[in-house]
Amino acid sequence: MADESNTTGVVSPSTRAWLVGLLALLSVICYWVMVSIALNPKLTLVYDVKGARYGGPLVWPSRLLHLAGISAEARMQIFLWLIIVLNAMWLVAIYLVRKDRRKSISIIIAGAFAVFCLLFVFGPMFQSRDVFSYIFFGRSMTVYHANPFLLIPHARPHDIIYPLVGWKFNASVYGPVFNYPSYLITKIAGNDITLNILGFKLLAFISYAACLPIVYWLAKRVSPGRENMALVIAGWSPIMVMHLLGGGHNDALMVALLLGGYLLYRKGWLLSGIAVVMVASMVKIVAVLAVAPMLVMYVRDKQGAPLKRLWKATVVVVGVPVLLYLPFLKSLKIFKTTEHMSTLYSSASIPRLVSYQYQKILRGSGMTAIKAQSVANTRVHLLFLAIFAVVTIILLLSVKDYRSMALAASGIFLVWFVTSSYVLPWYLVMGLMLTAFTGWNFTTGAMLGASVIFSFYRIPEPPGHAVGGPNVWMSVPLILISLVWLVFEGAKRLTAWRAARAGVTAAEALDVALPGD
């Protein structure tokens, strides 16, 4: 295969390498300034540990540019422009390396990612308190010898981590697999809050870093020539850099296991791959969505009887969660918090916007506000659940080979994000990682668009700027992206169906014209 980096284009290979290097350098500078601003505890860009002080290289931009005393309005403007510039450079980098498979480009991408890690891993919690909940769930086991699925933080108000926890009345909503690293980290860190935070951030960093070679390897086989494009999508995404590295979210561990399962499946270890993805779903349950296309592909495989293969897959899909939950399964109450979370609405979700407008109509017809909210939320939940089910079935019907399996999985994650009532920026990680190695397609474009929009999810606002109701700046653009994606995907599938029908008709006509003996 010819080296696509030398194909004729506007930019020569050497110039392209220099441009990618320049984008890497500028991205590092932007993230450095962002982290430096965030270290000022008065600016509320991060969730800090009381009394913590930061120094060294992390604070240099703040001192050099005199950012410590900036106003709240200036903080918002700087942060906004940093996000805009970082997303623009990310998209330009994707375009530049889309057909460039040179190792030198891979090294530049990986080197920049390493610097991003240094900037965020050793800083405070960036725009999220989730790690403080992780610490409490670990301490539930190591300190209180309790079940993290049953013990809520409010039951231990004198615990050292309690003042920092955001969800004080919620037990763990994560799977049993996450309990083990949580136990290990909190056991080692003890009562040292900073060490606990660093432990979970290092777990996120190691997991995130492990994803990149897997994405590169899969891209090399699924979409040859697009390896570096996959690498820059996965490694330079502002959402993933800020929230996986800065926020230390366990989504990194989940997606690392998920990609590991897809890697095993691609290598021919089919049931093992399905089992590992089920383990990923025992970190966060949403990863189970990636199993559906694998099951369709596994059952459709012509090796062996379909029913026998379906039975084997069912044993794995049911057996793995049962075995992993057994040590914690004292009663079905362990799922109470997860059930509660499934009814919540976040401001940026599309269902939140629809429910909000529907409530206005119901209140206008004379219904009380409380009843209108209950009725609207229930009906909107059912509506979007039906939309998710229909589109998912259509996507699963398209699974015919490994690439279409990965595309279906990334499409399902996109539809889940669009139809879910509670969404946060880092929920896009699964879809981004999967679509990264499938090359350029409509789903890749939609995932990139959604991630750019949701990188603006938490712009630090000056006092008095916050407003209630749905976040239309997030949900309306997401609706537009979803509609465009549905139109293009629908047109593509309709064209393919017509072509298949035409092929069948032509084959039937040929059989009539040339009958067999």
Set out the residue ranges of the language-model regions.
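Transmembrane alpha-helices of multi-pass, membrane-embedded glycan-processing enzymes
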Residues: 178, 182-189, 200-214, 254-257, ...
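Intramembrane catalytic core of multi-pass membrane enzymes that act on lipidic substrates
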Residues: 103-201, 205
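Perimembrane helix-loop-helix junctions
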Residues: 289-319
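Membrane-embedded helix bundles of polyisoprenyl
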Residues: 113-117, 203-206, 218, 222, ...
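Membrane-water interface signatures at transmembrane helix termini and the short loops
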Residues: 128, 228-262, 283, 289-292, ...
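Aromatic-enriched
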Residues: 439-517
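Start-transfer (signal-anchor) and selected internal transmembrane alpha helices
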Residues: 1-32, 63-119, 400-401, 405-407, ...
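Aromatic/glycine/proline-enriched transmembrane-helix motif characteristic
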Residues: 86-93, 212, 221, 320-322, ...
